[in-house]
Amino acid sequence: MAAGERILVIKLGALGDWVLATGPFAAIRRHHPGARITLLTLPAFAAWGERCGWFDEVWRDERPGWTRPFAWLGHRRRLVGACFTRVYDLQTSDRSALYYRLFGPRGAPQWSGIAAGCSHRHANPDRDRMHTIERQAEQLAVAGIAAVPAPSLDWLEAAADKLAPAGDFALLVPGGSAHRPGKRWPSEHYAALAQSLAARGITPVLIGGAPEAGILAQIARAVPAALDLGGRTSLDQIAALARCARAAVG
């Protein structure tokens, strides 16, 4: 692609979806080698965006509510003022599609996403039933990007030796989206799995944050051999642990 392009990639969250988007991030950078590429993401993932090497700039999306009109005006001013030549909306949510509307009827750049009227719309009616990796690959194919590599966190560097137990271990991550509890596997199933792993000489390592503290404590009580690292790991450290683990379930 031509040098001098200004590209915006939208990927807000959540954690799992952000990781799955690393393949598309790499593909977009390879497709636009001379472009200035900006990532719009949540503050929680901004540091990753700055470190991964695919972006020249990272914008933090504070996701202003409808009661903050001046914040929305500022958001629109920043988007329009950047003079983007193409946008890859990998979030493909109602909110990110609304960002397309902020450019106005005549000022929108080329746009890969689901917004009605955009130049490279992914209009597959079955897209919501596709796996994220396949869905994003098809979306980028519509925009002319044929090859999308597998997700990768190889650029993350963190030491796990101070956290990892001796011998074989497996990561158990019983948390999930707080507003979609139905997606979570029941804690008693994690406890049963932890017992099975421990019986095989594999230490269950429990991962989670403050919202999962109760669940982790419940599993740890049921399986004394488990190592509860709840609240003690950064995202980088979790990735480092995962590289050394025999398995991960979550």
What are these regions, as identified by a protein language model?
Residues M1-G250:
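Catalytic machinery of carbohydrate-active enzymes
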